Regions:
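Long, low-complexity, polar and repeat-rich extracellular regions
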Residues: 1-232
Length: 232
């Protein structure tokens, strides 16, 4: 079942409440101050953006500035394709935070062209993101990315071109098969990277290539397998 509506005014808003399996949802917004909501929605008191089920595909295109993409996704074998063109946009997504469907087999691709955007993606905070394939392609400056993943064989790849970008990534995992791969390829000026891989019963892998930067740049990497608490 899919319930969707658009509200037109100073802002365009899309309300989506999907349950079931096999859904293929394609949403596009052009302009400024639009919302696909969701968590902490404002403007016309928008709620929902809630996807529940399995084997779903969500394709989002937001073209413009100061737009918001907010919500909860509870799905196994989920494909998310997110394209943002413009600046000062907000992306806040939780994937199965209560372990309703688990978060296995997800494939998520986030493409960003623009500056001063804020992205938060939390996947499997109490579930396991088994076989997750997560790709970030970011072109622009002053973007902020925060991601927390309960990994189980997850791959997190980031390709960032631009200056003054900040990345905070935490990968946790507690079962014997947990283990994640994180790869960051960066070209640009000043940057702040804080990477934590915290699998307790398996190996983690990490590769960072960064070209550019200055004395104010910070790169902090922590790999901790039930060891003594560490910090940068």
């Amino acid at each position: 079942m899919l319930s969707a509506s658009a509200i037109y005014g100073a802002d365009n808003e899309i309300y989506v409440d999907q349950s079931g399996s096999g859904a293929n949802i394609d949403l596009e917004q052009l302009g400024i101050c639009n919302i696909i909501g969701g968590i902490n929605s404002t403007a016309g008191s928008l709620t929902a953006f809630d996807l529940d089920g399995t084997t779903m595909t969500l394709d989002i295109n937001m073209i413009g500035a100061t737009n918001k993409f907010l919500g909860d996704i509870n799905a196994d074998n989920f494909t998310g394709l997110y394209n943002f063109t413009g600046g000062t946009n907000t992306f806040t997504i939780q994937v199965d935070p209560t372990n309703t469907y688990s978060t296995d087999g997800s494939d998520q691709n986030i493409a960003v062209t623009g500056s001063s955007n804020t992205f938060t993606l939390n996947q499997g905070t109490t579930a396991l993101a088994a076989s997750l394939n997560l790709d970030w392609i970011i072109q622009g400056s002053n973007n902020t990315v925060t991601s927390n993943i309960n990994i189980d064989g997850a791959t997190n790849y980031m390709d960032i071109d631009g200056s003054d970008n900040a990345v905070t990534y935490t990968g946790t995992g507690v079962n014997a098969s947990a283990g994640g791969y994180f790869y960051l390829d960066h070209t640009g000026g000043q940057r702040t990277f804080n990477i934590s891989q915290l699998s307790t019963q398996d190996n983690d892998w990490l590769k960072i290539i960064s070209v550019g930067g200055n004395a104010a740049s910070t790169v902090c990497v922590i790999q901790n397998d039930q060891g003594t608490s560490t910090s940068c």
